[in-house]
Amino acid sequence: MFRLYDTATSEVRELRLRTPGKVGIYLCGPTVYGPPHLGHGRATLVYDILRRYLEWTGLEVRLVSNITDIDDKIIDRANRESRPWQEITHKCENVWFEAMGKLNVRRPTDVPHATEYVEQMVDMIATLIERGNAYVTDDGVYLSVPNVPDYGLLAHQSLDDMLSGGGDREVFGAGNKRHPADFALWKFSKPGEPSWASPWGDGRPGWHSECVVMSLSILGEGFDLHCGGMDLKFPHHENERAQAVALGREFANHWMHNGFVVDTEGEKMSKSLGNVANLLDLLEHYDPRAYRLVLLQTHYRSPVRIGQDNIDAAVNTLGGLDSFAARSQHLVGSVADTDVITRFRETMDDDLDTPSATALLFETVRRANAALDANDPLAGGLVAAVRSMCEAFGLDLKQASSVPADVLDRAAALDAARAAKDFATADALRAALQADGWIVETNKAGTTVRR
């Protein structure tokens, strides 16, 4: 039974599927106005791992992740640079998917663009007005938040508590709103801005209206899981859900949010704070798998600090895994060790506990190396288990090695000597490899040799 923390209920509970054997997931995608940062990378990697694991267990996953291709930030950049807004969104979307490809993030099943669903958004807003849950002002159309009785479910605050605390409320149209928490469903356009026709005047949809329409249009009511970063919980996801409630439509059954990427001071990285680390820089200078491995070693709900130390450590660990893959590539056809796979499923089924599952992976690599050293027939099952876990993680191993077999054998002998606490032999083997021009690095996955 797969269990996940549900933001709405504040508990780890079973992910109950609307249709047995099938999972419908909506992930809020990027607003394409600039390069992706590490926070974007974390969100897409977390949910890529989730998707891969669910498919690994035999479920059919439909992952919908949108592209917000019309937004105030896009318009602002277009105006600053005197460029067509479509040129900016097209280029930034291409950069986004190029980065996701390098991270080995699989393309979502569906990639809806907000501009493709404007007609449906207009229809939804019209329905909200007809139901008395939205109203027209001089600058747009707003949802009447007090008409949503359980507003604040995801934030775990009542509307009164939000207002008394200041809250993170929408500034747009502050002078025209009936209530401070009301938010824009439709924004009337200014001269020169992109716009679409509506019964109330030309304009564009509000951000919160885009995702609720796309998710319900593609996945339908009562879809299984809505995902995104912790920063989207409020107000974006709260406001998405509020519109569905105001429409009288069932929305997501389960809510999942990943933690922040923080800087060295523990501060959340964001563009508004000016401490964003560009994901493209990381991908240019490091093995892209290193970021995935660092995130696997951190629980998805916990904050993660990304620095040169933990990226370097991940690169070294990957080297050990690659050496193991090269050493064991001759073993084919074995069935994965049942005990290992059972333990793996137990940890992953418990709120996607990738840190424990990753520890199990390294433990299995060590056991497999020892079995290979001893020509133990159990080696095949352990090797197959390692491959299976890496498949579920989306962690590709570089099995084609440029390291000669005799060098790999000497590295394995070094590991065997260390395991036997025969450090004199281990040191001698290390010195001999170094004398032959090899860089020798040892970590918890074993010894890596490279030029």
Q: Which ranges hold each PLM region?
A:
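Alpha-helical recognition segments enriched in aromatics with Gly/Pro capping
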Residues: 1-33, 48, 97-98, 119-329
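Anion (oxyanion) recognition and catalysis
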Residues: 55, 129, 434
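Short Gly/Ser/Thr- and Asp/Glu-enriched loop/turn motifs at secondary-structure junctions
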Residues: 107, 137-138, 442-446
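N-terminal, positively charged nucleic-acid-binding surface of large information/translation enzymes
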Residues: 9-14, 18-106, 449
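Short phosphate-binding/catalytic loops that engage adenosine nucleotides
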Residues: 59, 133, 438
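Structural preference for alpha-helix termini/caps and helix-kink/transition segments
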Residues: 267-270, 275-451
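Phosphate-binding beta-loop-alpha motif at adenosine-nucleotide cofactor sites
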Residues: 108-116
